[in-house]
Amino acid sequence: MHKNSKRNNNLRVSHTEANSVDAEKEKNESQNNFFELLPAEITFKIFSQLDIRSLCRASLTCRSWNDTIRNSDSLWKPHCMTVRAVCRREIDDDLESGYSWRVILLRNYQKSKVKHEWLSGRYSNICSPISLPEKIMYPMDADTWGEILEAELER
């Protein structure tokens, strides 16, 4: 019987050590993720100050940041409103279809960049298709090309 009690004591020490290691690990994780210590309103305020690129990078930091950023639709709305200046019809159509602000931004961000370049006349004097930069092209519908043609005719 005496041997069993020694063995149980050894198990208890190991169990206590394991709890200590777990507690230390949780403490380190909490220190590394100070956002979890802040009130949700403060965290949201900080994230709302980020530009699109920084917001996307922050969402890659950890699961809790990703969840917060991904599920806070109001973080994405101001960025959508900026894109809407160039892609009004597309944004309005997506809103009517019930997409979230985040999805609307994902669907239209790159298109808005390319469309803005076309509308601003960046490609007005292209001599051949070879002159077009391939990496910034984006498929656009007939209505968008119509807007671009109208802008070209007004120049």
UniProtKB/Swiss-Prot annotation:
It comes from the Eukaryota. This is F-box only protein 48. Pfam families: F-box-like. One of its GO terms (biological process) is SCF-dependent proteasomal ubiquitin-dependent protein catabolic process. PROSITE patterns: FBOX (PS50181). Residues 7-19 have a biased composition (Polar residues). Signal peptide: none annotated. Residues 1-27 are annotated as: Disordered. InterPro entries: F-box-like_dom_sf (IPR036047), F-box_dom (IPR001810). Gene3D superfamilies: 1.20.1280.50. Residues 32-79 form the F-box domain. One of its GO terms (cellular component) is cytoplasm.
